Amino acid sequence: MEKPCTLLVHFDKGSPSMANEIKADLEGSDVAAKVDAMKRAIMLLLNGETLPHLFITVVRYVLPSEDHTIQKLLLLYLEIVDKRDVASGKVLPEMILICQNLRNNLQHPNEYIRGVTLRFLCRLNEPELLEPLIPSILANLDHRHHFIRRHALSAISAIYRLPHGDQLLPDAPEVVERALTGEQDASARRNGFLMLCACAQERAVAYLLTNAERVAEWPDLLQMAAVDLIRKVCRSPNRADKGRYIKIIISLLSAPNSAVVYESAGALVSLSSAPTAVRAAANTYCQLLSSQSDNNVKLIVLDRLHELRASHRDVMVDVVMDVLRALSSPNVDVRRKVLDLVLDLLTPRNVEEVVMYLKKEVVKTQAGDLEKGGEYRQMLVQAIHSCAVEYPEVAGSVVHLLMDFLGDTNVAAAVDVVLFVREIIETNPKLRVSMIQRLIDTFYQIRASRVCSCALWILGEYSLSLSEVESAISTIKQCLGDLPFYTVSEEGESTDASKPAQPVVNSVTVSSRRPVVLADGTYATQSAATETAISSPAVAPGSLSSTQNLRSLILSGDFFLAAVVACTLTKLVLRLEEVQPSKAEANKASTGALLIMVSILQLGQSSYLPHPIDNDSYDRIVLCVRLLCNTGDDVRKVWLQSCRQSFTKMLAEKQFRETEEMKAKAQISHAQPDDLIDFYHLKSRRGMSQLELEDAVQDDLKAATGEFTKDADDANRLNRILQLTGFSDPVYAEAYVTVHHYDIVLDVTVINRTKETLQNLCLELATMGDLKLVDRPQNYTLAPESSKQIRANIKVSSTETGVIFGNIVYETSNVMERSVVVLNDIHIDIMDYISPATCADVAFRNMWAEFEWENKVAVNTVIQDEKEFLDHIIKSTNMKCLTPPSALDGECGFIAANLYAKSVFGEDALVNISVEKQADGKLSGYIRIRSKTQGIALSLGDKITLKQKGGSS
């Protein structure tokens, strides 16, 4: 396994008797037995057996065979057998015996034997064996069969790339170039062209430019090789022919092969930043997006479009509608990426067209699969919400359509709709009247408690005119139904007093005022729907039921919603007193509201529900009752103005945060004032094409804005060097750790500090945790006071803290035993795998409820300020705080915040911090971590436990 090999087959260890059986079968005349014996011999050799005496047997009894299977196995055997003497490093003398056989095979009348022999020569590294075969190999370039010519070109390429291959085939590039001129086979042309690309790039470039007009007609294999060559050539400083290369790439954008088209688009973007070139690449990606059915291909293409958006947003804006057409894919991940990309490309010019397209998609979701349609509809609602917030003028065209989905069976989608309505009604005063009327009309359809709560708040805050207030109160009363909420049957009172008292069955009469929709779509004018239940329906708040409305939600025990109803009615009555000229009507409405509140309190304190009313909801409703009985001006101002002002302030802060984040992203480095400037009009006199001209100007712009300059990271690299041994150890070692997404690379520098040569020096590593070593350790010889760079690759499969430990083992001439130097442990930090991320509050709560792994860490710190402690945890965990700064301001003795991050493996890490200051000034509380996997929850908990004790260290 230490040697490079192209073949790997597992086989159990053999025995001497098996070696004798193989030898006997090879010496026999049975072809099938010979085939089986050759297979066993190959598997034994691959798994470490030497079989030293078998080679002569193979030469005597297998070499002369004409059977194709035996000849193929013979070549595999010759490929893996040791051809050099271990001690001297020279080719074994008996190996010369196979040269004549190989020469005969290269001249064999059977094309298959010639072809497989040429393919075998591609993996032969001994010049002594190859040199006698060179004339035969070259002769096969003129063979009539393309199979042989193809492998002859591959063999010439492999031989020429050997350490002394240019001595074996000094004129190989000229020979291959001549062969290419008359070659018609696609694979043969590709093999020859790749040989020129690797060994004689200038000849490959000359061949490409000579055939530039015909590249579009080349076979796809050769086109891919041409694209790779252009990438390599244009990386070099000499870019005189760049315009010709770009023309070739543009001609390949219309190639029939999708892989060629994709690679050409990527090459075009890397070659040129001119708007014309970028636009051509973007259009090509959009065509691939619509023509390819594989979702993985769509996701890859969308990633490329995201990269283009980051550097060429102005050009990408023109293809936004083409990108939107990818929403026809049923895959949720594709749709999500499309919407994310489109939202980044919104402009005042295209926002209306985008929103109209999204509206059509929303309507389509009603006819599709209910489950998938709900999730897709939620994404569309969020996208439209973002459009309307950024460009308020489009809100009016979509808000009424979306309000039809307030009663959506997908609660998350309905919540997104009502939050959208709440924000738009505040930011677009012109839409307030129509939105309030629409909300009143659709309020009966709402089935989710959270949606009801938000809708009631909207009605209480934004119903301003007399008709709006009266309609809102009437709607709430109708949804609550008849009062009281229950009646006690008195049948038990008529029983004979002499009989034992029987348990009284209490019935709850529930009346529903939900409007009935008839077959023709109109509302029924009469309803006699009354249902009697022995006990209240056990329906959890926020769950879905076909008969669920405001009344049934409250009867299910949702007293938080009942408290919201009480607050909304209080606001509406207070506003009615301001807009209603008739005092009697206002008092009548106030009395009706009080009756509803008292009925709710009575229901909450009764024994008919499984759970009584909670104290918070009870206090809230009682406060509303007292307020309506005795209202002061200050209290009226708080209820009618302060709540809305708080919401307005929250929206303003949200907008400010988003603006600041956009400004931070837009920060780019600038060039120095004395940098050279080229003028566009002066350049136009050079006779350049329009595309070359645009490209040159774009390069100048990039240089002027500092886009070409990368910050030097050398100082940061030094911080990641870990000392593995002490300075007094005979072998000093230090490692530089590079963390990639799925692997860790250790670049270990080993220094021999002694005056002796260290032999068989080996870096032995082991891992703990979800880490796995990829390479087997190798032995090295280290001269006195010299150094060696050793690289070790470690595979990572999950976000979990791991430990790498090991030692360095070596031998010296003076000491018989092997010496060992133990290395310091290398701890792989979870912080290398997680990065700050954002998500909506609704998504955070859904994940919090869904994730099963929780790690609860008690607060134990010397920090005495809550905000300082929160900042310390955020810095230590590399997470983003989702709680807005306004919610964290002020001194109140406690703090609660949510943190969020994503790992490179796509895992979500959720943290909730709840801290309270004690009387002695110390902080107490808990930090709860939730994730889908155990590893990230435990590792993050260990990190927090380790970091929270210190101050800002």
UniProtKB/Swiss-Prot annotation:
The keyword Cytoplasm is assigned to this record: yes
Domain of life: Eukaryota
HEAT repeat positions: 49-87, 93-127, 128-165, 314-351, 393-430
Primary location class: cytoplasm
Pfam annotation, one family: Adaptin_N
Cystine residue pairs: none
Record-level GO cellular component terms: COPI vesicle coat; Golgi membrane
Localization: Cytoplasm; Golgi apparatus membrane; Cytoplasmic vesicle, COPI-coated vesicle membrane
Keyword vocabulary terms for this entry: Cytoplasm, Cytoplasmic vesicle, ER-Golgi transport, Golgi apparatus, Membrane, Protein transport, Repeat, Transport
A biological process from GO: endoplasmic reticulum to Golgi vesicle-mediated transport
InterPro entries, A to Z: ARM-like, ARM-type_fold, Clathrin/coatomer_adapt-like_N, Coatomer_bsu_C, COPB1, COPB1_appendage_platform_dom
Entries under SUPFAM superfamilies matching the protein: ARM repeat
Keyword Transcription regulation among record annotations: no
Membrane topology: Peripheral membrane protein
Molecular functions per Gene Ontology: structural molecule activity
Subunit annotation: Oligomeric complex that consists of at least the alpha, beta, beta', gamma, delta, epsilon and zeta subunits.
Task performed by this protein: The coatomer is a cytosolic protein complex that binds to dilysine motifs and reversibly associates with Golgi non-clathrin-coated vesicles, which further mediate biosynthetic protein transport from the ER, via the Golgi up to the trans Golgi network. Coatomer complex is required for budding from Golgi membranes, and is essential for the retrograde Golgi-to-ER transport of dilysine-tagged proteins.
Protein name, per record: Coatomer subunit beta-1
Organism: Oryza sativa subsp. japonica (Rice)
